Amino acid sequence: MNLEIMQNSLVNFAFGGLLIAMLVYWISLAFPGIGGLNRLATLITLLVNIALTLTLSSRWFANGYFPLSNLYESLLFLAWGLTFVHLFIENKTKSRLIGATAIPVAMFVTAFASLALPLEMQKASPLVPALKSNWLMMHVSIMMLSYAILILGSLLSILFLIITKGKDINLKGSSIGTGSYKVKNTDAKSTLIFSSQVGIVQEQSNMLINSTRMNLLESIDNLSYRTIGLGFPLLTIGIIAGAVWANEAWGSYWSWDPKETWALITWLIFAAYLHSRITKSWQGKKPAILASLGFLVVWICYLGVNFLGKGLHSYGWLA
């Protein structure tokens, strides 16, 4: 079989598998009583990750360099990173939420790579001299992996904001959660305060609070924090590696290239998020808003700047 045909078949399989996995994850959340759905979705995601691994490995073998030299390859690597990180976190937390949020993004990325990009952008081309460096694999792979992790963490924060829309819910305690929360219905003046640590419930009205939902919100907030905490050090290492590579290739650590500027903005936003969690002990909506802003900025840094056709990192599609 022709190598290019095999790669296209694997990418098509990945897209179809992600579509099915997304539906299965959503059904498992809607009908938690149905057994085996989560395992099925996890198995499908694992097969998709293997398919993407084979695709990237075959391009590496065929072209002789790590497959991160163009937009098509970086999108496939991002989809691989999203599925890999999702499988890792799901294995650690046993939570279906990460799959229900990660898989749709991975599916969109795969579809965009295979359906939206022109064929000439999907083909590998010889590397320019500056890219013939081991820094290509280190810098770009770490940056893309950090993007994948930060996107997942930010998505969980967006999910938190969606669920809490219309309610003033403030989680109380340390930044990693203590089982305490305060809820205020924005449509009424009544307030209920609950603390699992002291076992006190004070009710000022007949408003009923679903404790299961509150525990879910705390889990989402917690998981978002831990995920972003994992991605931020990788982003930092990736930026430093890029600066060292830039000095080696062009004689300057930092040139305020649009990509570099937006990478710095991304770093500052997530640094502010972690600062608010660690030093201010923020939980709930305030840090979730910061993380949601970070979600937008990551995509601007990754795709928006590249499509402008300016700077060393540009793919020039819209130029």
From Swiss-Prot:
Membrane topology: Multi-pass membrane protein
Family affiliation: Belongs to the CcmF/CycK/Ccl1/NrfE/CcsA family.
Gene name, Swiss-Prot/TrEMBL: ccsA
Main location: plastid
Lineage top rank: taxon: Eukaryota
NCBIfam families: cytochr_II_ccsB
Pfam families per the UniProt record, alphabetical: Cytochrom_C_asm
Quaternary organization: May interact with Ccs1.
InterPro entries documented for this protein: Cyt_c_assembly, Cyt_c_biogenesis_CcsA, Cyt_c_biogenesis_CcsA/CcmC
Keywords: Chloroplast, Cytochrome c-type biogenesis, Membrane, Plastid, Thylakoid, Transmembrane, Transmembrane helix
Compartments in which it is found: Plastid, Chloroplast thylakoid membrane
GO CC annotation: chloroplast thylakoid membrane; plasma membrane
Cysteines joined through disulfide linkages: none
Organism: Pyropia yezoensis
TM regions (residue ranges): 14-34, 36-56, 69-89, 97-117, 142-162, 227-247, 254-274, 288-308
Protein name as annotated: Cytochrome c biogenesis protein CcsA
Any one biological process term the GO annotation gives: cytochrome complex assembly
Protein purpose: Required during biogenesis of c-type cytochromes (cytochrome c6 and cytochrome f) at the step of heme attachment.
GO MF term (any one): heme binding
